[in-house]
Amino acid sequence: MGKRLYAVAYDIPDDTRRVKLANLLKSYGERVQLSVFECYLDERLLEDLRRRARRLLDLGQDALRIYPVAGQVEVLGVGPLPELREVQVL
């Protein structure tokens, strides 16, 4: 299966964890709102993102939501659609 677009949103009250998660998500996609990223992921990258995010999150306080985007994305206002780019996880 190829890459598909996901919207990844988070709500994290702790500044340190929030910054760490945002930095992690920057390596997978593009920030489109303060706490929302758009990421093109295949199954391997999606599982890698989940695994790495679990290490950063406090599951009793934090929320991370990963939404697969079906169909075309429409943008009203400013902001381009995310580009499909090659992601390398080290």
Swiss-Prot record:
Transmembrane annotation, as ranges = none
Q: Does the keyword Nuclease apply?
A: yes
For biological process, the GO terms are: defense response to virus; maintenance of CRISPR repeat elements
Note on how the cofactor is bound: Divalent cations; Mn(2+) is slightly preferred over Mg(2+).
- What is the regulation of this protein's activity? Inhibited by EDTA and at pH 6.0.
Assembly mode = Homodimer, forms a heterotetramer with a Cas1 homodimer.
What family does the Swiss-Prot or TrEMBL record give for this protein? Belongs to the CRISPR-associated endoribonuclease Cas2 protein family.
- What is the protein's name according to its record? CRISPR-associated endonuclease Cas2 2
